[in-house]
Each structure stands twice: as structure tokens, then as C-alpha cells.
Design a protein with these regions (language model features):
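Active-site mouth of glycoside hydrolases
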Residues: 24, 29-253, 258, 349
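Glycoside hydrolase catalytic-domain groove-lining segments
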Residues: 213, 233-238, 242-311
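Short, charged N-terminal beta->alpha structural module
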Residues: 220-222, 230, 398-421
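A short, well-structured beta->alpha microelement
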Residues: 242-244, 417-435
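Substrate-binding cleft of secreted/luminal carbohydrate-active enzymes
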Residues: 306, 319-355
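Aromatic-rich peripheral "rim/lid" segments of glycoside hydrolase catalytic domains that contact
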Residues: 343-397
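Short, well-ordered secondary-structure micro-motifs within conserved domains or adaptor modules
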Residues: 434-448
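A conserved amphipathic helix/loop scaffold
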Residues: 448-657
């Protein structure tokens, strides 16, 4: 009865409600409240040359191993150069730059008068892809097909006729892209294993888009061509989080043209790599990006690629532990899937690009001989746990505050600080109409913080009406700041240093690059530095409250090592105090609450390499009635205590007594 209540209540509390607004084809592909686990696939024997070196027996064995280990969702890539091997035949003399005819193959054969031939598509490759689909269907494996692949592991596999042409703008290239897409989708749409189409692999870097107008024109053309040929399946957008309209591939545009949006949150680029691989920073990166993308873009999001450079980052066991916590974190934010890069290692291959300097060739879940790494068991156990649950889907967690941010690093930093403070955040673009909320965070408010006049007036109106606003200063020059924040700048000098900020019951070290001092006008000073200068203020604005931090520590913490082990999160907790039904007392053991009827599902995740063994605080009048975990040997709730091994998670069902 309890589990039936959870299922029914999910319809009332968010996850199913949002599903109604998305296309039916999308919800059927990756429903909310579950995490599909999968991989990106190239054949173990030949990688990017699998189609020209087709070996059905090897492929069948690959897919057998994957399906036996619970990996039933694959992203599989038709190598564009192999599937459309067209050559441009040029004139000479004054017309040297004019294409007179397009032929196929290095032997320059005339285009056959067939549907494939007129599209410049090699019939043999399509037949092989159809055979692949049949093998996948037999194994119960679903397929995502990025059609214009294209970009792959630092190399562009472009048809010879299109070499050195911009695929986003060149008319000749666009014509052949359209023919290719129409041919491939029309031919392959009968294959039941295919569940979604995609423009290509990381298609935004197939070439160089000049601006967002060109990006939209190209993506609209590609997606409409796919949908005309097959309106029954979802079409996935290009990857990545790009909040501002000023970007070349803005997420709002991408989402408007797509049924799904995706992240490729590798943890070895940029500042996410500052802390250890199994630290809270790394473990939450995929969840933060995917949550922000879905909320800002307004379309369901999932992790389409993710992986690790093992030798550089951690041990094999470390990857398995990392994956466990990462999956729990993704589930808590209602990411829909996680596909690892990639299924099989690409060791021992001298073909380009695997013999080049940049690629890491040991990224697989399995070695080339198909033996599994420890992370495979992690994926299998997580998938099995979901199948054993008595409820269909995890209801979405209700957000406690809205974060307005554009910068990727600030978004992730804000997510960490919020979750450490017990706040479940929602994200929104400061350029778009603001969602209603009781509390808004405006971290790293550089300049006008991307707020237009309309958005700033809207935000002030919400605060005046009773909402809370937090702003961290970064040479901010929004109008009426003295009135809103109750402070004014009295000193600014470009020299670095360290403030030790005293909040009374805790202290936080704040590194800075610019020294600033502020005068309190109508604001109350809540914290001071070692010189007695105010660093954190509170001001009444209408019926609402405004908090100001003179340090944009959300940004500066992210640029440095180990900052998330400090008490910085307590600043956010001061702004938005939250009481949970279950509280762990450890900033890195996150709890999210998911409402069902009169009860709660609490997802508890240890985002630390250190075991957690403590009696949590359970709110008076509530009791834990059931649990679930993917690692029962490491995660337990017994006699009122939670025991979580490193990077482990547990689900608690909590009901009123």
C-alpha cells in the first residue's frame, strides 16, 4: 500500500507533471525518476574503423557482454566519412574552385541511381548498420544514433568532398548533409532498437559557427530534416551548458529545437579538476551541470558522455567508488541517464586518432579482451537496485531557492555550497523571466550580473514583496544598489590578500584579488574581517531581506584547492535556513527529500572518501520505515544509525509515526 501511494503521489508532486509538458516520444524514451545506465560504443576490435572492418561476430560478442552486465542503452556512431564517401570533382583554369560533379569512393565512381546513391551514401555501410541494429534488438539494447559523426576523439571524420568546408554555412556541405540525414533516417527508422536520433557527436565542434544565428539556422535545418523523415522518435540537441544568449550555442536555443538536452561533464578539464577525484567537487559535477541545464533550458536532460582518465586521476577501485556516488547524485536531481565513455578500451591501435598525442585510450568499462573493470559492477548493481524498487519512479525534490547564474564554475560552486547547507537549489537564467521563489541567490554578481532592466526590476519587486535575496559582490553596478543592499563602496584597490571573516559562531578564510571596503548605510553588519571591516551585511528592502557578501567566494573558492572543506556553506545556510526530516550533521553527506503523499523518500549520499557512521537527526514524529541501496555491504540503516562507506548512498522511506 505504501509503495502504491508513492507511485500515485508522484503524479501530484512534480515528476509526472513536468513529463506531461514534454513530448510523449521523449517521456517514453527516458522517463523521469529513473536513471538509465549505458555506454558510448565503438567495437572492441576496430573502434572508429568498425564499419569498414565489419565483424558481426565480434560485435555480437561485445553486445552480449554489455547486456549481461545490465548495460542496455548505447550511443552508436555511423562514421560519417565511411557512410558518405563522396568526392568533389573540380574544374580547372578560371573555374578551379567550382565543383562540376560529385562521385563516390576513392575510385570516383558515379553515384548509383538509388535512394542511397543519390544521397552519396554507401549501401554496404547501411546494411552493416542494419545488422548492428538487429543484433542490439536481439540483446534488448536500445540505441541512440548521432548521425553526423563527424567529431570523434580530437578528429573530424568528414567526407572527402566536404573537407575544409564549414558544415554550418557552406551550401554544398549543407546540401549533402541534408541528403545524408534524409537517407539514413528514412532507411533506418524501421529498426526497433533505435530509440532516439541526434545531429551528431558533439556536433557544435564539427566546424566553427560564427554566431548564435548560424548555430540556430544549422540546428533547425538538421533537426527538421530528421523529423520530416521520422516524426516518431525524439531528437537530442547538441551537448553542453551555455546559459547566456551571448554564447554561440545558447542552451535555450538548443532546447527549443530539441526533445532532450545533454551534458558531457568530464572531470578532467578546468577547475573541477582542482580537488581529488573522489571529493565533493568532482562527485557532484555531473549532477550540478545536468540539473542546471534541465532547469535553465526547460527540456529533460541527461549525461550523454562521462568518463575518467584513470591512470591520471585514481585507481580502478576509485573509479568504481566515484561512479557509485555520481549515480546517486544524478538520481537525486532527476537526471534521466548516464552513458559512460566508453564501452571498450582502445588500446594497441595505431589508427588515427588513437595514435595521436591527445587521446587517452583506456577510458572503457571493459578492456579490449572484454574483461570488466570494477566500475561495471557498480553500474550493474545500481541498475538492479532500481529494478527491485517497489515504486516506479523517484518524485522530484522540491527546490528551496533559485540560483541566478551564467558562469559554469559558479553554477557548480553554488550547487556544492547549497547542498552542503541543506538547500536543494533550482537554477534560472538571469536573462529570462524569473521563476517565483521565496529566496534568490545571485552569486558572483559581476557588473550587471546579466540582468536586464526588466529582470532587475522584477527581482527587486519580488524582494520588496517579501522574498530574500543574496548577492555576492564582483564590481557590481546594478542601479539602486545602495537602497537595495543598504551599503556603499568606500574603498577599492587592485591588490590581493586574505580576509578572515568572523561570523560569530564560525570563521571563513576568503582570498581576494581586489581589496574593497564598504560603509553600512541602512544595513546591519553580520560579519567582519580581522581589521574590523564589515564583510557580510543584511538589509530590509520593502517586506523582504537582502544579504550582501563583499566576497564573491563562490567563484574564488572554485579557483582554489580544498575550499569546500571550509565553513563557507554556512553563509548560504544563514541566508536560507532549511530543516530536513533527516539531517546527517555532515556537510558532505547530502540529503534530498522527495515527497509522496504524507511521507518522504530521503536520498542520502556520502560525497566523501571517508566512511560515515553516525546517528542522524530524524524530525520528531517521523520514523524510517524502509531502506534501499545498491551496496548493502557498505550502506546500512540499523538501530537508528546510518553507516555509509566512501561514496555510498542509501534511500530512506520516512513516514509519520
Amino acid at each position: 500500500m505504501l509503495m502504491a501511494t508513492i507511485v500515485a503521489s508522484a503524479l501530484m508532486f512534480g515528476w509526472a507533471e513536468s513529463a506531461v509538458s514534454m513530448p510523449c516520444r521523449a517521456e517514453a524514451f527516458l522517463p523521469s525518476g529513473r536513471i538509465a545506465v549505458g555506454a558510448n560504443y565503438w567495437a572492441s576490435h576496430a573502434a572508429t574503423e568498425m564499419w569498414r572492418k565489419w565483424d558481426a561476430k565480434a560485435v555480437e560478442e561485445d553486445l552480449h557482454v554489455l547486456s549481461e552486465n545490465g548495460i542496455n542503452l548505447l550511443r552508436v556512431f555511423p562514421n560519417w566519412a565511411d557512410f558518405q564517401p563522396i568526392h568533389a570533382c573540380f574544374l580547372s583554369g578560371d573555374n578551379f574552385d567550382k565543383v562540376y560533379e560529385t562521385r563516390m569512393f576513392d575510385s570516383e565512381e558515379p553515384l548509383p541511381d538509388t535512394p542511397c546513391g543519390r544521397a552519396g551514401v554507401d549501401e554496404r555501410m547501411v546494411v552493416r548498420f542494419e545488422e548492428f541494429c538487429d543484433i542490439a534488438e536481439k540483446r534488448g539494447i536500445r540505441l541512440i544514433v548521432p548521425l553526423l559523426t563527424g567529431q570523434m576523439t580530437f578528429r573530424n571524420f568528414i567526407p572527402p568532398a566536404l573537407a575544409n568546408r564549414n558544415p554550418f554555412s557552406d551550401p554544398y556541405a549543407l546540401m549533402w548533409e541534408g541528403r545524408y540525414l534524409e537517407c539514413m533516417v528514412s532507411r533506418l527508422k524501421a529498426k526497433k532498437a533505435i530509440v532516439a536520433w541526434e545531429s551528431g557527436n558533439e556536433a557544435r565542434i564539427l566546424g566553427r559557427s560564427e554566431n548564435a544565428f548560424q548555430s540556430e539556422a544549422w540546428l533547425r535545418y538538421v533537426h527538421q530534416t530528421i523529423r520530416l523523415a521520422d516524426p516518431s522518435r525524439p531528437v537530442i540537441g547538441v551537448d553542453g551548458l551555455s546559459v547566456s544568449r551571448e554564447g554561440v550555442w545558447p542552451s535555450a536555443m538548443n532546447a527549443a529545437l530539441s526533445d532532450y538536452v545533454t551534458t558531457h561533464p568530464y572531470g578532467f578539464w578546468g577547475s573541477v579538476y582542482n580537488d581529488d577525484f573522489n571529493s565533493v567537487r568532482s562527485l557532484t559535477f555531473a549532477a550540478a551541470q545536468t540539473l542546471a541545464l534541465e532547469q535553465i533550458a526547460g527540456k529533460p536532460a541527461f549525461v550523454e558522455e562521462h568518463g575518467s582518465r584513470r591512470q591520471e586521476q585514481t585507481s580502478q577501485r576509485g573509479v568504481a567508488d566515484y561512479m557509485r556516488a555520481m549515480l546517486w547524485n544524478l538520481w537525486a536531481v532527476d537526471a534521466k541517464a548516464m552513458l559512460w565513455w566508453c564501452a571498450y578500451d582502445q588500446t594497441g591501435m595505431t589508427i588515427a586518432p588513437y595514435n595521436w598525442r591527445p587521446p587517452c585510450v583506456e577510458l572503457g568499462l571493459f578492456r579490449r579482451d572484454r574483461t570488466a573493470y570494477p566500475a561495471v559492477a557498480t553500474m550493474r548493481k545500481f541498475a538492479a537496485m532500481q529494478e527491485k524498487l517497489s515504486f516506479a519512479a523517484l518524485p522530484r525534490a522540491k527546490p528551496d531557492a533559485v540560483v541566478l547564474a551564467v558562469d559554469d564554475d559558479v553554477i557548480h560552486s553554488s550547487y556544492i555550497l547549497a547542498r552542503q547547507a541543506g538547500i536543494f537549489p533550482a537554477f534560472a537564467s538571469p536573462e529570462e523571466k524569473l521563476p517565483d521563489a521565496d529566496c534568490y541567490f545571485l552569486p558572483d554578481a559581476q557588473g550587471r550580473a546579466y540582468l536586464t532592466i526588466e529582470r532587475w526590476e522584477e527581482l527587486k519587486s519580488k524582494v520588496c514583496g517579501g522574498a530574500t535575496l543574496y548577492l555576492s559582490w564582483n564590481d557590481t553596478f546594478l542601479d539602486s544598489l545602495e537602497e537595495v543592499t543598504g551599503v556603499e563602496v568606500s574603498f577599492r584597490e587592485k591588490r590581493g590578500g586574505l580576509d578572515i571573516c568572523d561570523f560569530g559562531d564560525f570563521k571563513v578564510e576568503m582570498p581576494y584579488a581586489i581589496k574593497r571596503k564598504f560603509n553600512a548605510l541602512t544595513a546591519e553588519t553580520l560579519a567582519r574581517n580581522q581589521d574590523g571591516d564589515g564583510v557580510f551585511f543584511r538589509n530590509r528592502y520593502g517586506k523582504g531581506t537582502v544579504y550582501l557578501s563583499i566576497h564573491n567566494f563562490e567563484k574564488t573558492f572554485y579557483e582554489r584547492v580544498g575550499r569546500y572543506e571550509s565553513d563557507g556553506f554556512k553563509i548560504w545556510a544563514t541566508v536560507r535556513p532549511v530543516s530536513r526530516i533527516v539531517e546527517t550533521g555532515d556537510k558532505n553527506v547530502f540529503v534530498s527529500e522527495h515527497v509522496f503523499g504524507g511521507g518522504r523518500i530521503c536520498v542520502v549520499v556520502n560525497n566523501s572518501p571517508v566512511p560515515y557512521d553516525r546517528r542522524p537527526t530524524v524530525a520528531e514524529g517521523w520514523r524510517v520505515t524502509d531502506t534501499a541501496t545498491d551496496a548493502p555491504e557498505l550502506a546500512k540503516f540499523k538501530d537508528g544509525r546510518i553507516l555509509l562507506g566512501p561514496n555510498c548512498g542509501i534511500l530512506l522511506i520516512v513516514e509519520r509515526k
